[in-house]
């Protein structure tokens, strides 16, 4: 049984060692507490025991607190700003931000800037770019006014509070573009002292029902002598909202206009469009649509013939008025000359 006592003794030895270690640790803790209690309290004048005093550090601190007004030029030039800007971490974001701002400005000027009047349209638009807007009024059978809305609904028009098309006539003054339909000529309404041409009210009513308050796409070609923009106009109408329709072509098919006839300066938007317009006019003429009803009868005249006749009448009136004015002036001069002579034919 001796080996049992030996084994039990070997097992108790570590326990005794652990007890001794715990006792030693307790003694060390007591010594540490005593040393802390015996250490004098720190004061602003006394240095930290773990950090010995440094003469250079105290000098720098004293200088910084004693002179609050520092030399800013020295402090700014002391930093390597050029190196900071050349750092890719700063240079790349700066270039991206600057490029993005310039790109947005260019997009706004080229595509999102609103054009208030026809006279504000740059010649760079003609035959190259288009305008998008809403029709606010129809003045005649072949012209109307449009409020330019660049970008359409994608740019916030019609649904953002600050991008609304005005409805009041007073608010639309000097803010709409006057459009003249290219390639067609509709009967004239009464204006400038001229009487109305047959089917002029019908053509005006047709165009009003077709375009008023609709969004249209305008392809400008030039400005005419009245400050209007001669352009081809497209509109989308229900139920064929995915198919845009040429407004001038639709008027020719309905017999509400004729192909514009002039010696020079006629805009169609291309030779192909002119031939298409003439075919549509020929079909409407054969079927007697609109103003082509009874066009073979006596007294019928096209819009161009009406304009030529009215121009002749106005020319005759102007010539007669000029002759009457000259005769009156001559008569007044003759009466004045007779008054200057005496009874015996001598001057007074």
UniProtKB/Swiss-Prot annotation:
InterPro entries per the UniProt record, alphabetical: SNase_OB-fold_sf, Staphylococal_nuclease_OB-fold
Compartments in which it is found: Mitochondrion; Membrane
GO cellular component terms given for this protein: membrane; mitochondrion
EC number: 3.1.-.-
Main location: mitochondrion
Binding-site residues for Ca(2+), renumbered to this chain: 185
Ranges annotated as biased composition (Polar residues): 59-70
Active site: 180, 188, 228
GO molecular function: endonuclease activity; metal ion binding
UniProt key word Membrane: yes
Membrane topology, as annotated: Single-pass membrane protein
Pro residues: bias regions: 41-52
This protein's UniProt keywords: Calcium, Endonuclease, Hydrolase, Membrane, Metal-binding, Mitochondrion, Nuclease, Transmembrane, Transmembrane helix
TM annotation in the entry: 91-107
Low complexity compositional bias, start-end: 15-24
Organism superkingdom: Eukaryota
Cited Pfam families: SNase
Domain (TNase-like) ranges: 129-294
Region (Disordered): 1-70
Family statement: Belongs to the LCL3 family.
Name of the molecule in the record: Probable endonuclease LCL3
Lineage: Eukaryota, Fungi, Dikarya, Ascomycota, Pezizomycotina
Gene (name only): LCL3
């Amino acid at each position: 049984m001796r080996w049992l006592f030996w084994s039990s003794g070997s097992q108790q030895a570590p326990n005794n060692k652990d007890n001794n270690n715990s006792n030693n640790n307790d003694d060390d803790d007591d010594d540490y507490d005593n040393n802390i209690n015996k250490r004098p309290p720190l004061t602003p004048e006394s240095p930290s025991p773990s950090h010995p005093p440094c003469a250079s550090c105290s000098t720098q601190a004293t200088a910084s607190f004693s002179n609050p007004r520092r030399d800013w030029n020295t402090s700014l030039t002391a930093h390597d700003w050029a190196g900071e800007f050349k750092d890719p971490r700063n240079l790349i974001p700066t270039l991206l931000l600057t490029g993005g701002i310039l790109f947005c400005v260019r997009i706004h000027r080229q595509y999102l800037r609103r054009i208030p009047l026809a006279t504000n349209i740059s010649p760079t638009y003609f035959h190259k770019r288009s305008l998008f807007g809403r029709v606010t009024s129809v003045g005649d059978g072949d012209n109307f006014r449009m409020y330019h809305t660049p970008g359409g609904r994608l740019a916030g028009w019609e649904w953002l509070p600050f991008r609304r098309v005005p409805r009041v006539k007073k608010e639309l003054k000097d803010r709409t573009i006057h459009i003249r339909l290219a390639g067609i000529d509709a009967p004239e309404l009464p204006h400038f002292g001229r009487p109305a041409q047959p089917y002029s009210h019908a053509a005006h009513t047709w165009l009003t029902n077709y375009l008023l308050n609709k969004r249209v796409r305008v392809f400008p070609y030039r400005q005419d002598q009245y400050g209007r923009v001669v352009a081809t106009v497209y509109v989308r109408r229900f139920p064929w909202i995915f198919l845009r329709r040429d407004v001038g072509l639709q008027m020719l098919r309905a017999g509400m206009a004729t192909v514009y006839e002039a010696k020079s300066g006629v805009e169609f938007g291309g030779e192909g469009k002119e031939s298409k317009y003439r075919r549509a006019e020929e079909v409407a003429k054969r079927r007697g649509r609109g103003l082509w009803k009874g066009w073979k009868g006596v007294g019928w005249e096209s819009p161009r013939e009406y304009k030529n006749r009215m121009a002749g009448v106005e020319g005759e009136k102007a010539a007669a008025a000029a002759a009457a004015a000259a005769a009156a002036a001559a008569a007044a001069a003759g009466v004045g000359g007779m008054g200057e002579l005496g009874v015996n034919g001598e001057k007074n």
